[in-house]
């Protein structure tokens, strides 16, 4: 298991949920919900601020695939957002399968007694926790990083993957 805090990113149309791991990759905890900025880059800037605050070594972006494994419009959106993050930072960015993370988050919140109206502010954070916890468990079991590394568009000879 690699050492270093990871920051999970659950990309939604209106909001982006963030969750972080401890440096040893044992547990994921919610951080905050960032408003989506479709017209600008305030969302990317905020995510990178949080990453710097926690001394993040990797960004884990959830990749929403259909149950069949096929790409959807949300898949394309998450991939585009992951590329924007990768182009804006030296931190590694990985795309990790997140099928059913939002459904699992809704179920967990409902089981904890939160109705659908009370879920809205935290649902994206809980989904990010589920994405990150799954990624951490997958890495522990497989012995290698989960998902796919997102390449950067600009060439930087000092960057190490």
UniProtKB/Swiss-Prot annotation:
Residues 142-161 are annotated as: Disordered. GO terms for molecular function: nuclease activity. Its main location: cytoplasm. Belongs to the YqgF nuclease family. It comes from Clavibacter sepedonicus. It is found in: Cytoplasm. It comes from the Bacteria. Keywords: Cytoplasm, Hydrolase, Nuclease, Ribosome biogenesis. One of its GO terms (biological process) is rRNA 5'-end processing. GO terms for cellular component: cytosol. Could be a nuclease involved in processing of the 5'-end of pre-16S rRNA. CDD domains: YqgF (cd16964). This is Putative pre-16S rRNA nuclease. It is an enzyme of class 3 (hydrolase). Pfam families: RuvX. Its EC number is 3.1.-.-.
